[in-house]
Amino acid sequence: MPEAVAKMRVCWLVRQDSRHQRIKLPHLEAVVIGRSPETKITDKKCSRQQVQLKAECNKGYVKVQQMGVNPTSIDSGVIGKDQEKKLLPGQVLHMVNGLYPYIVEFEEVAESPNLTQRKRKRSDCDSEEMEAESGTGLAPGSSPSQCSVSPKKDKNGATKKESLGHWSQGLKMSMKDPKMQVYKDDQVVVIKDKYPKARHHWLVLPWASISSLKVVTSEHLELLKHMHAVGEKVIADFAGSSKLRFRLGYHAIPSMSHVHLHVISQDFDSPCLKNKKHWNSFNTEYFLESQAVIKMVQEAGRVTVKDGTCELLKLPLRCHECQQLLPSIPQLKEHLRKHWGG
């Protein structure tokens, strides 16, 4: 008997004048849209974070929250600063001042058995990276010692993986929380990593909604350079007197769907660094140097990630200073103390 074809409902934000490609709005995930290379909007009256969109795919509408000062409207009705309205298919969203018209489209997408199998394989890699990264921004009042997150279990006792949408949601909430912010300007915000893997570990995030390195183009080049410069500024401002060495870079396959630059000291002295995947996500080619990413975009117009990259998370533990192999994380940490004199 043939296997039933699974279907899923997806939502798209579509610019009516077709100035750019449609933007996918994942189910129940907050997506911030505004002035950016992605939307092709350069009007300074449109904030870089003009609206927050959250698709209710099962119910067939999108919640729109106006975040910018200037008015966003749905069918000529102004939403209002920090207010929220529903956007239904057939209605027109004007991003700011009655300009830049958008509509939403919902469609049923059939998944073939082969696609489902590929997605399961990809999900395995995602869950490995999710465990490797596990960070969204430091919660108020927390400290590096507060790193444990109790895994959720179902009634049979099986551990449930946190969904990609949940992590992304937490990251975007952290970006907007003044208590989380270390630095911000009109292009980026810097927050502390919620689960720091070293004494100093920050995330530099653009306000513009850029889902991953996969969608980065030459149009984002200046933003990438600015993110790098801000990372160096944060090091100078908050660890300038430290003798610690730092690296700036991106995870090749991030667990959170919003581009973020890691700024991390190389002591790796943190109780949050708990397993091989944590270590290898920062100490193999899984970690893409910021300057290398910038060079790649300069020369090729995009970022290329090698096939099989997620397998790097399974490599043996190796000291990043002297290349000695260590059998376990506790022994690696003990070994690292010899390098930083702890």
From Swiss-Prot:
Region (Interaction with DNA substrate): 193-197, 255-256
Residue numbers marked as site, Interaction with DNA substrate: S174, H251, H262, K277
Domain HIT: 168-273
Keyword annotations from UniProtKB, A to Z: DNA damage, DNA repair, DNA-binding, Hydrolase, Metal-binding, Nucleus, Phosphoprotein, Zinc, Zinc-finger
Domain FHA-like, first and last residues per copy: 30-79
C2H2-type Zn finger ranges: 317-339
Residue spans of biased composition, Basic and acidic residues class: 151-164
Annotated function: DNA-binding protein involved in single-strand DNA break repair, double-strand DNA break repair and base excision repair. Resolves abortive DNA ligation intermediates formed either at base excision sites, or when DNA ligases attempt to repair non-ligatable breaks induced by reactive oxygen species. Catalyzes the release of adenylate groups covalently linked to 5'-phosphate termini, resulting in the production of 5'-phosphate termini that can be efficiently rejoined.
The protein's name: Aprataxin
Native source organism of the sequence: Mus musculus
Gene assigned in the entry: Aptx
